[in-house]
Amino acid sequence: RFKGINVTGWTRSGRAPEGIHTFENLETLVEKNDILILSLFDDAAVTNILDALLRFDLKGIQIIDTSTVSPQILIERADQLYDKGAIFVDAPISGGPELVENGTCGIFIGGDDFSAERAAGHLSPISQRIFHVGPLGTGMVMKTINNSMVQIYVSGLTELIPLAKKAGLPLKTALDILCTGPAGLPVVSDRIPKILGDDATVGFTNSGTAKDNDVFRKILHHFDMRSPLLEGFERQRAFSEKMGLAERDPAEVIRAAYDVSEAT
């Protein structure tokens, strides 16, 4: 149960998450539930699951896709889902595990008014920061803008923080000043213990951030746009891999850049 709500699930891997009753197959999950929240790794996974769902009777079932993937996957199947009787929105989540646990993550819903209002009610136990931003697909567009700004900020910090080391400025001093002034962002201030090496837990991996970066650039490309700043993230990706930090938290890349005095 989650906040008094019975939660059941199904995983493609067959893994049973702790505390959640899981069904053996997707068909049974659909039969036993009228709300399906998708949280999948990439475009291929979402494509596979949506196509599988289209084989079932979806009348009255709400599909809420929280995955960080191209919105075109859902948009291209909208007519088929509608014909099957489904109600559907894209509703990507912005914020790492700590924000989800605290109920402060952002959820950006794209869809018609009825579907979005219904989805917001189902998602309210997860967070109160829920926004209906526009028609189907705009939820992921909003996440692209929001999380791209975070990526650009962190990339800029990893590029500039070696200057502090070279000049003899302590890392903690630089971070404290940044995070208490106009240049501060929660994505850094909340991670100061991780950056300083006092907290080894991983909120989100560098490889996951790199995957999201690929999605964001793909979405820009769909609208005939590009972002040199987002493309510059490739330097941070290469640096994290070079330092063996691909599966570690982005905070550790900031510390590594300081320690080796190497701009990413």
Spans of model-derived segments:
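Anion (oxyanion) recognition and catalysis
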Residues: 1, 82, 124, 165, ...
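NAD(P)-binding Rossmann-fold cofactor-contacting core
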Residues: 1-19
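Short, well-ordered alpha-helix to beta-strand connector turns
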Residues: 4, 19-20, 32-33, 104-105, ...
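Hydrophobic beta-strand scaffold residues
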Residues: 7, 22, 87-89, 130, ...
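Rossmann-like NAD(P)(H) cofactor-binding subdomain of soluble oxidoreductases
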Residues: 14, 24-105
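Short phosphate-engaging motifs
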Residues: 45, 73, 115, 156, ...
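Rossmann-fold dinucleotide-binding core
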Residues: 69-148
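Helical "substrate-binding/catalytic lid" subdomain
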Residues: 138-261
